[in-house]
Amino acid sequence: MTDTAKYEKSSARCWICYEEYDKKLCSLSNDSWRRPCRCSLIAHESCLISYITRSGSTRCPQCLTAYRIAKPPKEKSWAVNVLGIGHSLEAGLAQVTFGVGSCLGITKFIYSIFKQTGIWICKQVADESSLIEMLKKPVFSSVVLPLLPCMLVRFYEAPPYDIAFSLYTHFSIYSCAEKISNTSLLLCTLPWVRSLYKELMTRIFDGIVIGADGEFEDSETDWFRQFEAQVEHRNQVEDVNEREDTESEFWILLSVAHVFLDAFTTKILRIVRPILLFPLAGKFLGRFIPGNFTKLEKSIIGAFAALVFKDIFVYGFIAWRKRKPWSIRILDNPRRVSDS
């Protein structure tokens, strides 16, 4: 065993299956011979794999040299590779198509809702003949109509530092009309008038307008916190054994209803309110405006007047709330009063 050259020339056998090494047969056989260690022990590759699988050892039993194990090379035909690539592309395209189709379906649904809402708004403030002429223009029917509800929401909020969106919509309206009229000029000046109006109201009410909506919400929150504090104080004073389950359930339902109504009014109605009420208020108040104005011009002036009346009412109510804060009373338990 010490003379390696003599061992290789005389009788080289697989140390696992004891088959003799034949160089001619080795070139014809698919099972190649391996010499993975330093002690010149050779073996078939299949025999080595079987030995490693059965014993769980990856070292030579004689010299304890660790075998170098590598993944076999992939020997697939081009047809199999093409089928694999096609299967991967099919799965990927199915996922992408489903995602894109879902997004397009949701977008189309929202777009149709906004477009129908825009048509309803135009019917409230414009004549039918002028509306038919405007709908014949592709830019107006496909771009401007879906933007009208968004324009009303932006104009209703109307921060002085963000009027680009409203200006874009207004310019789209009169560019589709292919002429500059009094109505188009009035539409273009609405954001600037709203900004000046906001600044004027701020000067008049001396700080009441600034953060009025947030202050109103804070006052409502303080009101509810005061309400909860009194309820908690009452529950602490009362004896736990004398509480009735119906009363506790009533206060829980009242708290849940208040939270739900608060979320509904502040989130949903804040968006729906200007879209629905703004055109209707303009249509109603526009009837009382004298002069040779068109229906659309009267509707715009009436809507702006409704906005002014709304702001005056809200700011006046907030000023009154500041001077006369609300107070809440929780009545005592009638049973406890009679016992005392």
Curated annotation (Swiss-Prot):
Query: Which InterPro entries is this protein grouped with?
Result: Znf_RING-CH (IPR011016), Znf_RING/FYVE/PHD (IPR013083)
Q: Which UniProt keywords apply?
A: Membrane, Metal-binding, Transmembrane, Transmembrane helix, Zinc, Zinc-finger
Query: Under the cellular component aspect of Gene Ontology, which terms does the record hold?
Result: mitochondrial outer membrane
Q: What is its main location?
A: membrane
For the ligand (Zn(2+) 2), the binding residues are C37, C39, C60, C63
What is the annotated localization of this protein?
Membrane
PROSITE patterns cross-referenced by the UniProt entry: ZF_RING_CH
**What biological-process terms (Gene Ontology) are attached?**
positive regulation of mitochondrial fission; protein polyubiquitination; regulation of mitochondrial fission
Q: Which residues cross the membrane?
A: 249-269, 274-294, 300-320
UniProt organism field: Schizosaccharomyces pombe (strain 972 / ATCC 24843)
Specify the protein's topology with respect to the membrane. Multi-pass membrane protein
Identify a single GO molecular function assigned to this protein.
ubiquitin protein ligase activity
**Per the record, a Pfam family?**
RINGv
Query: DNA repair as a keyword?
Result: no
- Write out the residues that bind Zn(2+) 1: C14, C17, H44, C47
* Full protein name: Uncharacterized RING finger protein C32F12.07c
RING-CH-type zinc finger locations on the chain: 6-70
The reply to whether tRNA-binding figures as a keyword in the UniProt entry is: no
